[in-house]
Amino acid sequence: MTTHSGPARHPAVVPDVDALVSRYVTPGTHLHLAMTMARPNAMVYALARQFAGRGAFTVSTSATHTAMHALTMSGAVDHLITCFLGDTYPTPRPNPLYRDLARGEPFTCELWSLLSFTQRLTAGATGLPYGVTASLVGSDLERGLAAGGRGPLPGGDGGTADGTPKFVRMADPHGTDRTFGLVEPLRPDLTLLHGACADRRGNIVLVPPAGEGAWAAYAARRGVLASVERIVPDAFVDAHPERVVIPGQRVVALCEAPLGAHPQSLRGLSTGEATQDITGYRDDYAFLTELVESLATEDGAKEWYREWVEEPGSHAAYLRKLGPARRAELTLDARPLSPRAPVTPPRDPAPPFTARPPRAAATPRPRPEPRTPVSRQERTVILGARAIVQRVTEDGYDTLLAGIGVSHLAAWLAAARLREQGVRVPVCAELGFYGMDPEPGDVFLFSQLHATRSQQLAGITEILGGMVAGNRRCLGVLAAGEVDSRGDINTSLLADGRWLTGSGGANDIATSTDCLVLSTASPRKFVERVAYVTSPGARVREVVSHFGRFRRDGGAGSPFRLATWLPPGYDGPATPQEAVAQLTRWPAPTSGCVPEPEVTQAEVAWLRSLDPQGFYR
């Protein structure tokens, strides 16, 4: 029998993030960086300062981007467990830091999909010997994890497998042909997270979208290190117990860190009492753009690291460097910037599509000239939106899951077109957005401005689990680095060993629901066989290019044919046959191909109202 004595402890309250990590983190620790919309970036910078070159950490985090690049550059990470390595703004793209990941540089890496990663945390949090997932089966992710998961990646020589399978494929005990996987629980030593506020007892308020939610806090063997925007009186939490997501019993120590998620965002907390409100802030797009540009070269990366990590020396100095004007500009209103347009059934059963007028964005941005030529990416988005509209109206899908990139723009545009026809189809995003109504002028999928305009704010499990894997009427919309004639998708690793970005939630979507895939066509993207199967293509219904739509007439494994044709312009092939031959490596027939209607000015205007800066041109 185990006995316990003594009063319940309260977490330590320390002065700042540097004191927090230096007192409670030791080299060799397994640290988990919690994946919510407000990531613990101030603590990540502190880890880089305090443990540069000597951390030898195992780090688990579902996405490796933004401030995590600083921890990579510090040399403090020995092994990484993740789902994505790259950049997400202004567009999803590889980051040079991870180019040689297949060779074990800058660390060994264990790769998962977003839902299976979260299911591992759930298993760890609830004391289960395994988690269960329907993701990963049939992909190169499965093959790597079944071999031990510590490396090497296909085509490389980095790392040494630890011999313990992280994923074991299982047959359905009821005798169906469906297979699933048992996954090893994820149990870090410490979970680091950033919250909106906490009391001195350690009760932490998180504001949705929740991402992975509280699972990592419960899974951590030693507990949680937390930074918060503000430490509030106990009475505040006692009056709002429904807002507490992490109980104080799980918290080892905490500190205040205003703007602790910068350059990412935090949704504010309105209490009805102005003195107790927690002010939210938007993603700092200027900072994120500067970061991506700086890390494009080795010298630029060193200079950025010196300027923003080493020289400030503390979070307080980091905030002073940002300056009050910049901080004020990032302030997020608790309400939508502009009201939702009322949705009423159209009088005309087949009204012409008209562009929704742009509404006030957070920062006014110049709009492109209306006669600017339509780019290949824009044509891909528009044809993708048309494909989505047709699939929804003909096949009865009731939900769209938007992946990041051209795919989420196509989903947004399709939802707008359907809305004008009196059909409401909610658009979801993997971190917890449901029923998004995007703010014109903000093209970033995970913007807090879109959260403010959503019907529900939930988490990864609710969206990728409940709304995708558990919903037979969801249509996934994905982008691809490579896509082959079987529909297999690669967003991970090229044949020459260069790293792309990884799965994120794409594998979870492709293995559980019907999908459309969007990509501008070239022989480099439309390949005979992908170099790495990030997402199996059995459930891909269509692949949309800038010159037409490839469609399967049969089920999984049936061949694609070019079903529609939109001449790609004066500089492109003149016939469907020439386009397939010159712009793909697919053996796709073109018989029965029908003309695609010309791109309209209304379609282009609507798309550019979302993307006035032309990131997707």
Q: Where are the predicted features?
A:
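Short acidic loop-to-helix transition motifs that present clustered carboxylates
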Residues: 64-66, 433-434
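N-terminal low-complexity or amphipathic/hydrophobic leaders
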Residues: 24-27, 31-33, 37-57, 383-430
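Polybasic, low-complexity association/targeting segments
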Residues: 425-442
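Structure-specific endonuclease nuclease cores
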Residues: 376-380
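Conserved phosphate- and dinucleotide-binding cores of soluble alpha/beta proteins
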Residues: 2-23, 35-50, 67-371, 382, ...
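A generic "binding-loop/recognition-motif" signal
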Residues: 64, 210, 406
